[in-house]
Regions:
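Glycosyltransferase catalytic domains, chiefly GT-A lineage
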Residues: 1-274
Length: 274
């Protein structure tokens, strides 16, 4: 984890042309490591960096009501069972109203471009949009929606772009906190009843935390989401290529253009900088 955090923070800070306000969510044992990594990265900063470490338990305590109905549907006994993977769904509760925009980043990322360029995508959100995420670049939800897709021939849910919506990946999330707070639609679905409706309609049982919820909500109410270009979350994992989906894998995994953020999910190696 230390190496991943070092790569992510180091690239974020080194390439930023604007002052940064950075929040690192951590636990007690990891806090000292995070402080050292942050100090090392900040030494190479070209802009001001204001950083704060937030304890995961303090962040999650106000969200336990949400987690209580999300976790049974969108987690397993493995890595993604941790409550941390539902933090983004209620993060609008945790920041004061003066904070309008938030960019959430996994730590298994390496930036190749200035984060200010990513922030510019907030200006592209249509009215009513609350979040921006890139598509999932594997047929994860083609698999997860197998029953729904059998019962609804011709559906675009779980299909690769451009003809369909393959679901989202939450490695990079742009959140308009004000829009989330003002969205009656989001509030409606971020409830025990709303989640139950979604999982029943789509015959879905997931294990990837918040991105499962966003994917379901994106199929049901696509107007809530801005689709971030794949180059801002260029996922590298190819697990599904070797587990039953080799024939369609490239349709999902294709991502043309200069990569701004590499995402080394499932411990994939990130290409070296040339």
């Amino acid at each position: 984890m230390r190496e991943k955090l070092s790569i992510c923070l180091g690239s974020l800070i080194a390439l930023s042309s604007v002052p940064l306000r950075v929040y690192i969510v951590t636990d007690g044992p990891s806090a000292d490591v995070a402080r050292q990594v942050l100090a090392d990265a900040s030494a190479k900063a070209s802009s001001d960096v204001l950083a704060e470490l937030l304890h995961v338990d303090d962040m999650l305590a106000p969200l336990l009501d949400l987690i209580s109905f999300l976790q049974p549907h969108f987690s397993s006994a493995g890595y993604y069972s941790k409550k941390l993977f539902f933090l983004s769904t209620g993060v609008h509760r945790l920041f004061p109203e003066g904070v309008r925009h938030l960019i959430l980043l996994d730590i298994d990322l390496q930036l190749r471009s200035d984060i200010a360029l990513l922030h510019h995508h907030f200006a592209l959100f249509p009215t009513g949009t609350i979040m921006g995420l890139g598509y999932e670049l594997q047929p994860v939800y083609r698999h997860g929606l197998h029953k729904y897709r059998q019962e609804h021939p011709g559906t675009t849910c779980g299909e690769p772009p451009p003809r369909g919506n393959p679901g989202f990946n939450s490695g990079v999330v742009l959140i308009d906190l004000e829009a989330v707070r003002n969205s009656s639609t989001y509030k409606k679905f971020l409830s025990a009843e709303g989640v139950e409706f979604l999982v029943k309609k789509y015959s879905f049982r997931g294990n990837l935390g918040d991105q499962d919820f966003y994917s379901l909500l994106g199929w049901e109410r696509p107007e809530l989401f801005y689709v971030l270009p794949c180059t801002w979350n260029r996922q590298l994992c190819e697990w599904w290529r070797y587990h039953g989906y080799a024939d369609v894998f490239d349709e999902y995994h294709r991502c043309n253009g200069s990569v701004h953020i590499y995402h080394g999910n499932c411990n994939s190696s990130i290409p070296s900088v040339r």
